[in-house]
């Protein structure tokens, strides 16, 4: 055991108590660092075919009352007929049994996949996409199956109480996962509604809670949306979902590691591991629900200098 811990000093031999690489350590009950005892190969107690495939990610844990193992693979060679897979196994009394085979979940050759659970659901994040794995997909004869679906990014309400001429009050932060943002207006009988400077298009329009199919047109140069029939006056009764030119989605998909935190409820998901000194974390939607589909742009923590990438996060206690 190392006592006391002198910290991490990468690229140097260091003094006693300092670690040159933050790998293969675990924390004891006394808060000390100790080396892990090592690993040994075990024969898998179930059929698992990896011919032509490379394992890109593994996860084991509980979903509901069941214990599962998830394995992500992608082809060792070119991506073609031999695509990527996620295989899910359920533990039974006699051992693990196949629960699902999810072919081409990312639709591209992955370099890595990290699995994590958040609010009782299983997610798979990779350099090629972000998936939520849930019941209802391909299944075996006697075992409930699973399906992998792309995580639908939460669209934040960034401005509320705006007049058709603009203004309003800032509410939610933009979501790194998407270039979509919402703004609500209090109609005054006008037909023309000015959008923020970042708007390059309009994706959806609601009036008094009803979604309308192309009720007007958007002029990208003036950033004005014009209704063919002006909405009736009201308070926050017009909502326009607009598009920004870009998003920070690639930053999220570059995070290889995760940790959950926030007391007993674990309402925050922290992502890190893109080679920077920054970790980002999820937020809470307007309705008050924690969401793995919402990473507010300002929810980040920078540690030390830019030349000191984060190599590990640990939830300690609680």
Specify the residue positions occupied by each region the protein language model found.
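Beta-sandwich interaction modules
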Residues: 105-120, 226-228, 248
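N-terminal beta-propeller domains
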Residues: 1-98, 147-178, 251-318
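Short, exposed beta-strand/loop patches in secreted or surface proteins that constitute
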Residues: 59-62, 88-89, 111-116, 130-132, ...
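WD40-like beta-propeller blades
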Residues: 95-108
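Short, hydrophobic/aromatic-enriched beta-strand segments in well-ordered soluble domains
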Residues: 236-244
């Amino acid at each position: 055991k190392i006592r006391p811990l002198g910290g991490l000093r990468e690229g140097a031999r260091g003094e006693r108590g300092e670690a040159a690489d933050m790998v293969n350590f675990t924390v004891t009950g006394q808060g000390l660092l100790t080396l892990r005892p090592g690993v040994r190969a075990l024969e898998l107690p179930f059929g698992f075919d990896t011919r032509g495939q490379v394992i890109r990610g593994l996860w084991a844990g509980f979903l509901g009352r069941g214990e599962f193992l998830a394995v992500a693979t992608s082809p060792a060679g070119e991506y073609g007929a031999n695509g990527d897979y996620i295989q899910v196994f359920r533990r039974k009394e006699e051992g693990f049994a196949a629960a699902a085979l999810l072919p081409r979940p990312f639709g591209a050759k992955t370099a890595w996949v990290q699995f994590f659970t958040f609010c009782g659901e299983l997610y798979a994040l990779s350099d090629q996409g972000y998936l939520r794995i849930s019941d209802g997909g391909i299944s075996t004869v006697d075992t409930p199956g699973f399906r992998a679906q792309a995580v639908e990014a939460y669209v934040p309400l960034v401005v509320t109480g705006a007049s058709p001429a603009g203004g309003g009050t800032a509410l939610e932060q933009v979501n790194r996962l998407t270039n979509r943002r919402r703004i609500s207006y209090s109609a005054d009988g006008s037909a023309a509604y000015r959008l923020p400077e970042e708007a390059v298009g309009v994706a959806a329009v609601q009036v008094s809670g009803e979604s309308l199919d192309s009720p007007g047109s958007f002029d990208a140069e003036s950033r004005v949306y014009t209704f063919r029939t002006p909405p009736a006056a009201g308070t926050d009764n017009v909502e326009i979902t607009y598009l920004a030119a870009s998003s920070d989605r690639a930053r999220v998909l570059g995070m290889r590691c995760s940790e959950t935190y926030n007391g007993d409820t674990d309402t925050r998901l922290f992502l890190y591991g893109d080679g920077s000194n920054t970790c980002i974390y999820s937020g809470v939607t307007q309705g008050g629900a924690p969401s793995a589909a919402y990473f507010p742009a300002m929810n980040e923590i920078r540690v030390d200098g830019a030349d000191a990438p984060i190599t590990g996060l640990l939830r300690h206690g609680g």
